[in-house]
C-alpha cells in the first residue's frame, strides 16, 4: 500500500550526531523515495522461482502488477546486482533498463498514464547471496537434514527482499492484492510459502511445483520460501486455521511444542484483536535458522526448546516459561506485519511492541508479577550505543535497543497512564486502528496522546531519540526533599510513583526543582518504584 511518507525533523544533538554517519548513493537508492518509486503503487506480485539446491542457483519470474499514480515513463524496481536480469517484458516486448547498484531503472519508452493498471514480467536468474548467520545477515541457507535431504530457507529483513526476487524494495509499498508464490523444486521435497496452499503439480525432469497464494497485503521481506522433507499437520482454533510444517524427524516434538500456539492466540487476540490475516491462515514452519516473522508462515528454528534456544534473555527464569520464537515472531503478525513502519529508521514500531508482547503473554498466562520481573530483566541487554530511531531515507535502522528499551518504554507509559483498563483498550485500539497500515513514529505518538488524553510526546522523544534515560534527581534540604528530572528533551514532566514509610505517593516532577511536602529524615526513606518506570536515579 503506497503511503505518503512523513518525516519528523528532530534537532537533538543525538540526531545531529547520527546524521554525521556516512551514507552512500547505494543507501539512498535503497532507502529513499524518488519519482521512479512514488509514481506507481504495487498491486500484486506473481512470483515463480525454480531452485536448484546442488548448484545453489535459481531461475525466477516476477509478474509485477501496479497502478500508475503519477504519469511516468521510468520506474525503479530492485534486484541485487549479483543476480542476472534475463529480460523485462511489457505487453510482450522487451524493455530497456539501466542498473545502478541494486536499483533497476526500467524505461517504458512511452508515458504510463495516471490511473492505469499495468504489468511487467521480470525474468532473472543467478546464485543468491548465502547468509553467514541468518537471520541477522540476509540471504539463503542451504543445509541438509539428518537424513541427508536438502533443507533450504531464506531470511532477508534489513538486507532486502531484492536479494532473491525483483520487487519495489521499500516498506512504503506492499502489494495491495497480495501475491502468489510458485516454487519449482526437486521431487521428494516439499515447498512451503506464505498464505494458502493451492496444490502441487508434478512437472517434467524431476521437478514439482508447489503453489501458494496470499490474499492480504504483505511486506516484501515477509515473502519467503522453505524447502525440505516436511510433514504437515493442522488444527483449528476459534475459526482460525493452524498449519504446521516440520521436518519428518521432528513431528513428535513439534506436536508437543506447538501446543503453545492456542493459548498464545487466546492472549494476543484478547489484547490486540483478531489475528490480522485470517484469510491466509497461521503457519509455523521449521527452518534452518532461528526464526523470522514471515507473514502467515512464521519461521521456527528454536530447536523445540523453551526460552531463547533454551536460555532466558531476562535472567529471571521466567523467560523459560515459553518458547521465545513462537511468541515473539507470532507477535509480529500484529506489530510489524499488520502495522508496518514506512521507513526502517522507525523499526521500533515493529520490535518494541513485539518485544512487549512477550511480557503480555506472560501476564496472560502466569500473572502480572512474573511479567513485570521478566520485562525488567530484559534491561540487562540494553547497550545504549545510539538512538533507537535511525536516519531516514537511507535504509538505516537505529539501535538494537529498539527491542528491550522499546518494550520498557511501553511498560513505563503503561504506569504513567496508571489505569490498566485504559491501557489495554489503547493497545487493542492501536492494533485495530492501524490494521494493515504503513505508519511512522509521529502517527504512533499522536494516537497514544489522543487516547490517553496526555501529552506523552516528551516521553517518547526521550526514549526514542536519546541514549540517556530520564534521570530522577533528589536532594535533601534540611528536613525536606527536593526532586527534579534531568533529561535531554526541553520539557519533561513524567509522573512517577515512590514509597515512603509504607505509603505509595505519585510525584509529578518537572525539570525544575520541586519541594516534597512531607518531612524526611534521610533519602534512604524513599523507594522509587523502578520496576514500573525505566529510569535512572541520582
Predicted features along the sequence, with ranges:
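N-terminal, polar/Ser/Thr-rich
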Residues: 19-59, 86, 143-149, 457-458
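Extended, low-hydrophobicity, Ser/Thr/Pro/Gly-biased non-transmembrane segments
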Residues: 25-26, 121-229, 526-535
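Surface-exposed beta-strand/loop patches in extracellular or lumenal glycoproteins
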Residues: 61-82, 166-171, 175-186, 442, ...
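A surface-exposed beta-strand-loop module
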Residues: 80-143, 206, 211, 517-520
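Beta-strand-rich binding/interaction modules
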Residues: 84-90, 192, 456-457, 472, ...
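Juxtacatalytic substrate-recognition/specificity segment
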Residues: 181, 208-211, 229-333, 337-346, ...
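Acidic/His/Gly-enriched intrinsically disordered linker/tail segments
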Residues: 215, 347, 351-409, 416, ...
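Amphipathic alpha-helical substructures
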Residues: 276, 399-477, 481
